[in-house]
């Protein structure tokens, strides 16, 4: 088949993958004439066989309307006809000996001469030589074509022969049963004539084992791929649902915690409105009278409209990251179960508390938040009195230390401004 116009120019010009793929499809799907061969095309052959008994004038013609043979991969796709002639000798059916001869019938010619009729070599497959050797020998002996029948035991199975270098004459393969029947007729002295015509074109030639293997492999790969995607999708869906449930639960807990936080309306004279007053860390605006503010457990103050949406999503202070759920002792449900975080909201501190504990910030924030909640009442004297009562003596062999413990504060400077009467005193007594 000739090259499609412009195909070479496109490929030499660095064509894109999509354009090259389109050209390849055109090359594969383009129609082919019977005189040309596709790389994977298989052409069948229609056979018209006639039997003629010598000296009796009786002709027996059998029309074969089915696909009886297969053209070789290197054979010309042309019709051909002739008398079938097997190799001479009982052991020469394979035609592997280069000296093999064929006894070709003749017909009377002009001036009393005899002329060989057009004939086709009938050769059996096998014998230790290739298809090309058999076909080339038949061509050298003057045959118009070669008819090769399959091994014994293969019934009427045929394959597309590969015979490079031996494409001078038509070569087809027929089944063993068909070839044996013709051979037996010839051996009984019956002249057999065969007319070969081009049949139908078929796709790539594959045997039953290849089809079975490809089908099973495709099924396994498809099943594995579908199973993986089902498992992956189910896992993602389960994780998404669990995450959604967790987020909804956390938002519900955050709403509960926000409802327990203190609200206060700013009035003229509050320290947040004074000359040294701070601004809201969320909107960066100064506090004004009648502003509604939210006081968190860590004593940080924000506009209610600014901090409430933040707390719903993050549940922590925008400045110090103090967890309001832990500080208020609200139970937090997680995926594996329910964990209750109970944090005492009081001014008392255990004498053996480690400064490296993870919940120290929450306890500190809770203590400070309790002091802010009672800012409008007179609890400062009670705090100072309680702090003086929390004097403990800790003995460590040769050294002893007495510590005055006051309520924990998250921001000492802020607490000193709010309650200047409180002091933190640490006395170390060495014995």
From Swiss-Prot:
**What GO MF annotations does this protein's record show?**
ubiquitin protein ligase activity; zinc ion binding
GO CC annotation: cytoplasm; cytoskeleton; endoplasmic reticulum; Golgi apparatus; late endosome; membrane; perinuclear region of cytoplasm
* SMART domains registered for this protein in UniProt: RING
What is said about the domains? Binding to E2 ubiquitin-conjugating enzyme requires an intact RING finger domain.
Give start-end positions of Polar residues composition bias: 345-354
Q: Which Enzyme Commission number(s) are on file for it?
A: 2.3.2.27
Instruction: List the glycosylation sites.
Output: 48, 59, 101
Q: Which residues form the PA domain?
A: 75-186
Q: Does the keyword Repeat apply?
A: no
Its pathway, per UniProt, is: Protein modification; protein ubiquitination
Describe PTMs of this protein.
Answer: Auto-ubiquitinated. Controls the development of T-cell clonal anergy by ubiquitination.
Report the record's Gene Ontology biological process terms.
protein ubiquitination; ubiquitin-dependent protein catabolic process
UniProt name for this protein: E3 ubiquitin-protein ligase RNF128
Against SUPFAM superfamilies, the record matches this protein to: PA domain, RING/U-box
Q: Where in the cell is it found?
A: Cytoplasm; Endomembrane system; Cytoplasm, Cytoskeleton; Cytoplasm, Perinuclear region
Chain ranges of zinc fingers (RING-type)? 280-321
Q: Which UniProt keywords apply?
A: Cytoplasm, Cytoskeleton, Glycoprotein, Membrane, Metal-binding, Signal, Transferase, Transmembrane, Transmembrane helix, Ubl conjugation, Ubl conjugation pathway, Zinc, Zinc-finger
- Give the source lineage, highest ranks first: Eukaryota, Metazoa, Chordata, Craniata, Vertebrata
- In this chain, the stretch annotated as Disordered covers 345-431
> What is catalysed by this protein?
S-ubiquitinyl-[E2 ubiquitin-conjugating enzyme]-L-cysteine + [acceptor protein]-L-lysine = [E2 ubiquitin-conjugating enzyme]-L-cysteine + N(6)-ubiquitinyl-[acceptor protein]-L-lysine
Looking up InterPro entries in the UniProt record yields: PA_dom_sf (IPR046450), PA_domain (IPR003137), Znf_RING (IPR001841), Znf_RING/FYVE/PHD (IPR013083)
Annotated TM spans: 211-231
Q: What does this protein do?
A: E3 ubiquitin-protein ligase that catalyzes 'Lys-27', 'Lys-48'- or 'Lys-63'-linked polyubiquitin chains formation and plays a role in different biological processes such as modulation of immune response, cytoskeletal dynamics or protein homeostasis. Inhibits IL2 and IL4 transcription, thereby playing an important role in the induction of the anergic phenotype, a long-term stable state of T-lymphocyte unresponsiveness to antigenic stimulation associated with the blockade of interleukin production.
């Amino acid at each position: 088949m000739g090259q499609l116009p412009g195909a070479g120019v496109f490929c030499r010009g660095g064509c894109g993958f999509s354009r090259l793929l389109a050209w390849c499809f055109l090359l594969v799907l383009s129609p082919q004439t019977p005189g040309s061969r596709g790389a994977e095309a298989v052409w069948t052959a229609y056979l018209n066989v006639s039997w003629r008994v010598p000296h009796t004038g009786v002709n027996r013609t059998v029309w074969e309307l089915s696909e009886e043979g297969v053209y070789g991969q290197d054979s010309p796709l042309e019709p051909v006809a002739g008398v079938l002639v097997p190799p001479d000798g009982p052991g020469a059916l394979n035609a592997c000996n280069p000296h093999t001869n064929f006894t070709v019938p003749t017909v009377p010619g002009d001036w009393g001469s005899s002329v060989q009729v057009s004939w086709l070599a009938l050769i059996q497959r096998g014998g230790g030589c290739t298809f090309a050797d058999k076909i080339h020998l038949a061509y050298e002996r003057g045959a118009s074509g070669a008819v090769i029948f399959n091994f014994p035991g293969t019934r009427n199975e045929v394959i597309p022969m590969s015979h490079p270098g031996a494409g001078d004459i038509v070569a087809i393969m027929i089944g063993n049963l068909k070839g044996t029947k013709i051979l037996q007729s010839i051996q009984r002295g019956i002249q057999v004539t065969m007319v070969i015509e081009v049949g139908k074109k078929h796709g790539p030639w594959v045997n039953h084992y290849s089809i079975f293997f490809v089908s099973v492999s495709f099924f396994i790969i498809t099943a594995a791929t579908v199973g993986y995607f089902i498992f992956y999708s189910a896992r993602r869906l389960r994780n998404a649902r669990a995450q959604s449930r967790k987020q909804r639960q956390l938002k519900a807990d955050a709403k509960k915690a926000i409802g327990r936080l203190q609200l206060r309306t700013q009035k003229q004279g509050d320290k947040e409105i004074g000359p040294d007053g701070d601004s809201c860390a969320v909107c960066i605006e100064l506090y004004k009278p009648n502003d509604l503010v939210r006081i968190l457990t860590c004593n940080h103050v924000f506009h209610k409209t600014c901090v409430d949406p933040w707390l719903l999503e993050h549940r922590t202070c925008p400045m110090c990251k103090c967890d309001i759920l832990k500080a208020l002792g609200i139970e937090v449900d997680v995926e594996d179960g329910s964990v209750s975080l109970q944090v005492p909201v009081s001014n008392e501190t255990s004498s053996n508390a480690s400064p490296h504990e993870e919940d120290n910030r929450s306890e500190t924030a809770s203590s400070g938040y309790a002091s802010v909640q009672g800012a409008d009442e007179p609890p400062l004297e009670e705090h100072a009195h309680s702090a003086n009562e929390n004097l403990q003596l800790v003995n460590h062999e040769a050294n002893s230390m007495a510590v005055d413990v006051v309520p924990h504060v998250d921001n000492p400077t802020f607490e000193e401004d709010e309650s200047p009467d409180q002091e933190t005193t640490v006395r170390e007594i060495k014995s």
